[in-house]
């Protein structure tokens, strides 16, 4: 197995943490919570260094469906070129 050198670790791009209260898009399914990739949530807590987040997912009427602990790679910021859509909750 190849291991990255210390030099390559330092050359890796720095990803800026998403600040609290920003909207994010879920990048993976979280079936245990009934969440799907593409669901939109709000960051309610940023773990040290932006390694992970607590993200609240709500219905369009504001009812909280889940608060998920995710690592940074499981979410991404929303972009200006995206439009949300609605889906029926299962269960």
Q: Which residues does each predicted region cover?
A:
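Extended, low-polarity transmembrane helix blocks
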Residues: 90-91
């Amino acid at each position: 197995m190849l291991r990255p050198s210390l030099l390559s670790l330092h050359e890796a791009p720095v990803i800026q943490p998403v600040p609290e209260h920003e909207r994010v898009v879920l990048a993976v399914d979280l079936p245990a919570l009934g969440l799907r990739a593409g669901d939109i949530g709000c960051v309610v807590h940023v773990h040290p260094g932006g390694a992970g987040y607590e993200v609240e997912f709500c219905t369009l009427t504001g009812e909280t469906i889940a608060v998920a602990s995710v690592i940074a790679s499981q979410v991404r910021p929303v972009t200006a070129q995206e439009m949300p859509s609605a889906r029926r909750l299962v269960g």
